[in-house]
Amino acid sequence: MSLLLARAAVNDANIHFDRLYSYLIPAQLVGKVYPGSMVLVPFGRGNKARMAVVLAVEEAEETDAPQRLKSLYDAAPEEARLTPDLLELVRFLKERTFCTWFEAVKAVIPYGAQYRPAMVDGRPVMQSRLTRSTEKLYTLAGALPEKPKPGPRQLAAVEALKNGPLTARQLDEVGISRATLDGLVKKGILTAAEQDKALDLFAAIPFDPQPLTLSAEQQQVFQELLPSLEDDKPHAALLHGVTGSGKTIVFLRLIQRTLALGRRALVLVPEISLTPQMIRRLKSTFGSRLAVQHSALNNTERLLQWRMIQQGNADIVVGTRSAVFAPLQNLGLIIMDEEQEHTYQSESAPRYDAHDVAKKRAVMENALLLFASATPQTETYYAAKSGRLQLVELRHRYGGRPPPHVDFIDMRAELAAGNPREVSVRLARELQENLDNGEQSILLLNRRGYRTIGMCTACGHVLKCPNCSVPLVYHKPQHALLCHHCGHTVYPLPQTCPECGGKINYSGFGTQRVEEELAGLLPTARILRMDQDSPSRKDAHETMLAQFARHDYDILLGTQMVAKGLDFEKVTLVGVLGIDSLLFGQGFRAYESVFSLITQVVGRGGRAELPGRALIQTSVPDHPVLQLAAAQDYEGFYREEIAFRRFGLYPPFCSFVVIGFIGDQEGAVLIAAQRFGVLLGEHAAQKPDIPLRILGPAPMNITMLNNKFRYKLTLKCRNDAAFRALLHETLDAYDAEKLPQKASVILDFNSDGDL
């Protein structure tokens, strides 16, 4: 019998050692190790036990020198094995994002499904990171004999199981004891098997299917998408629908058809706060074969939900970015709602864009990928206009409702009139009118904290984080200064300047300050603040939104999490505060982000029978982006934006790649960035067919973060296989350089200009 080799990628290997290593498969593991298997291997001179993933299994050749190879220590059970599809996604992440093999593996499977090395009886073995929680599942295997006459509980058990298998817990709820079940198993009438304990996160949501009644426009969109859903080939489409046009009911109808075809559906949302609303619609319409994947679940919950999907017990999965890796088989439909949101891009390794992974999955599964938004990314809309995506549109609000009426409040005039508050006189008056009418309001301020800057009145010194090159923010509940990047805290609140002893003046405003101001202006108003500081429990967002939906609160004040996808029938007034700082932000997507944010939040008003209105506070009311957003004129904005992108050579007319350099010494980081740029230019000169512009090096927007200095090179390029090969060559050449101090290198292929 020939020897078998496993080609495996090892955990905790840095990028220089991240390659496939060959190990012998010992006799006791033959038949248990396949591509995708998680294994335990000896690594390095000390043969330290390391986790690894098998990428290939091959017969050993003489050239492999099998007598010199090490053997695998252990292999995980079959259930931990990556399916061929998931393994293909690991390869995809590795090739596209330049991450390590195991960084890709950890993105694809949840923490609880991973294993760790352990020692048992002096032998290295693999242990699950979480203790498995199981329960017995009973299945009817035969008929009850007529003699001896069966008892009433035995009859009840058999009757209950005629409609399908049930767990011991479910049978206990109808009065059937474990002793009765065990007796029937001994007689061969039932079979019992261990399965992962079921976790019904949505038990409180009733299954209450209602007819999915589409408007004529919605029905037309559904009919236009239907051929792409049914022909078992990969397709991609963009559903561009104005706010309040009823995109969700089109989703439900498409999912209904997908399930009727015997296939499964994946629904992606950009924020955890949007999952409860989507889950409620899906559970009430389609029942309990529904799973969720997002970071607010604890490790046990995520594992049980993941296993439910893996075992084929979920037909629909809803979740945030990481749900794009859900192990759904026979996937027929992928919906990416609010596709323009930056949260679909990972900010840590692997730095993937869920758009790219969803496209890959659609091709692998012959599925329909549907992007949806009222304000799609410029690149997505350009692709649709160019014919690379099918374009379907909902141009009218559901039920013929008019869009909210939008007015601007010039904050320069407000200040000149003697109002120093953050809430204008008119906004306060209209909030009071809503209170008097029993209606609700939403206020958007995309800035946390109480005061956003502390400055000395004598010398102008700004209080900054000692670890990061950013101002500290005053948070009143803690009576302390906080860094929103590293968490550094200064307590008690400084009153004098550390440089000259002068007085510190705190200015700027965040959600905490506006909440306090509203309480003074509207003493009877019930105000709910929703930002990253307010939730303390994992289900806090869901609880808050449910309270607001019940009208337990009159005003919902929050950051961008209140701007998208929420649907409250009594909200008739939307206010936008502090938008100017975003309008003049850095990055080529700044205008796109502001247009999207305003359009989305304005669209939260007037979604039922009551008309909506919106007030935008700004010092630049005539700015064209604000005017276009107020008019809900996406086409007009797109024409302006695509002209700017074409002139400046920004996506979609090139790929935008940022290479970051991070280290302890600023001078060394700058030298490393300069040297990398030179090497890249030299290698690119040998390949004139690869279009490339190298900009920089330059400091990142936040030059120091967590005591590390940060510089960047910006590349305008065509991100194809040839370009990525060029980057690999340059990285190898950089690694071979004899620099006094090297910097860590980070590549981001989906950047807006910074890391």
Region annotations inferred by a language model:
Residues 91-94, 428, 515, 519, ...:
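Generic solvent-exposed, charged/amphipathic alpha-helical segments
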Residues 1-373, 380, 385-401, 683, ...:
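Accessory, non-ATPase domains that flank or precede helicase/AAA+ motor cores in DNA-metabolism machines
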Residues 209-215, 219, 223, 232-670, ...:
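Inter-lobe coupling/hinge segments of SF2-like helicase ATPases
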Residues 3-5, 18, 47, 438, ...:
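A general secondary-structure signal for short beta-strands and their flanking turns/coil
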Residues 14, 522-525, 680-693, 737-742:
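Short secondary-structure junctions
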Residues 678, 682-705, 709, 745-755:
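A carboxyl-terminal module marker
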Residues 5, 34-35, 426, 522, ...:
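A short, contiguous, amphipathic alpha-helix enriched in charged residues
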